[in-house]
Amino acid sequence: MPIDHSGTTTNGGLVLSATGSQWRQSARSLLGQLYLMFVSMLLLVVVPGTSAADDRWHPGIYVKIEDWQLRSPAQMETIYEELRNTPQLRGIKVILLWGRYESRDSRGGASRYDFSQLDEILARLGALENKHLIVALAWREFKSAKGASEILPNDLQGGRAWNADPNRAHTQYEYLWAYRMSNQPGKYAYNLKLWHPTILGRLDAFLAALAAHIDQHPNLTQISTTESAIGEPVTSFVEEGGSAQRQYDGQLAVIRAMKKYFVQSDVVPDFNYSREHVAAMVPILQAEGIGLGSSNSNKSKGLILQPPSGAPGVLTYYPRLSGTVILAPEIQGDDYRSTYGHDTPPDHPRYESIYLRVRDELKANYTVMQRNNPYWLGDASTPSMLKFIQSYPAIVNDRTGAGGLNHVKPKSVR
């Protein structure tokens, strides 16, 4: 059930009596109350770790939960058991498919929100020691299987058929409110049309409802997004009714809505491409107290490029922003496979080098590790990342719980 914010607080007042002793007693009581209020305010300013915002500052190592894992009770039980047995893991990151949590009756037109899945996750994390949740809104998805998607609510899923794809049977319909980015079998992809007022208005209402329901929960630490790359639309942006710049503007509108509604939790969106878009966003992140996340931390050319002119890669901003905004580079399958990204030969870097890059070169406060095999659990020829986390001295011996990452709050954290 949504948290009830309708309660009110009353302040007790002094009732002056006719006698001087009662008046003096009341005066002393008032002075005592004022003194306690002053001391409390002073503690909030000068004593580290005493502000309410600290309840949401939980830097460290998190695990990314794939949607197929989220939909499997057996998989989730395994993940909770890993969290229970691994103090070095700070929590999990869950990707929010908008259509799973909002639906509409076409006859009435009113949105219904069902956040029971998140309620269950937060309850399970709350029952564990020092475990927290990051939620990430999916404005982009990749599809390899047939069938409908939950990237959009049910009433926004219908649309005109687009017949140029010879493998069109991969999905039951086309999306009127999402544009396609690929025709390659196994690599179908969609982005929400964030330039459209209908989508932005509905997302604004969804985020308001989501925040009202979970933002006060002490085990929620962040809200994020999927990556900023917008891809190349199969049909041109002009045909679709938008433009690349308007799509990027829509991303910023969604991020600002998160910042508006999630007043307790930190906002750390995911940026990778375009480099020009990232360059335009960095000053805004600094000015508005928004963090910087990235879905990969490898040395792919596009991520680390520092041209003599033009926009640099997103990972070049991390060291210079350390101490200013929250930094959250992630470790995904591409990072396990190759030092230099998905389009280079695999060299399977040592887990220590992957971790040290995130910690020392990128100055991370948070990192999210993809829980994909064989890397996570290991096999006959692949070591286990989970066992690395459970045994690496710099992670195990960090008393702050941050897994060796930078646990000092940046200026942007309230």
List each model region and its residues.
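Bacterial N-terminal signal peptides
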Residues: Q33-V46
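Boundary/entry segment of secreted carbohydrate-active catalytic domains
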Residues: A53-R90, I95-L97
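An active-site-proximal structural segment forming one wall of the substrate-binding cleft
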Residues: R124-G126, N183-S224, G250, V254-A257
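Aromatic-lined carbohydrate-recognition surfaces of secreted/lumenal glycan-active proteins
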Residues: N219-I230, V254-H277, S295
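Substrate-binding cleft of secreted/luminal carbohydrate-active enzymes
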Residues: N296-R414
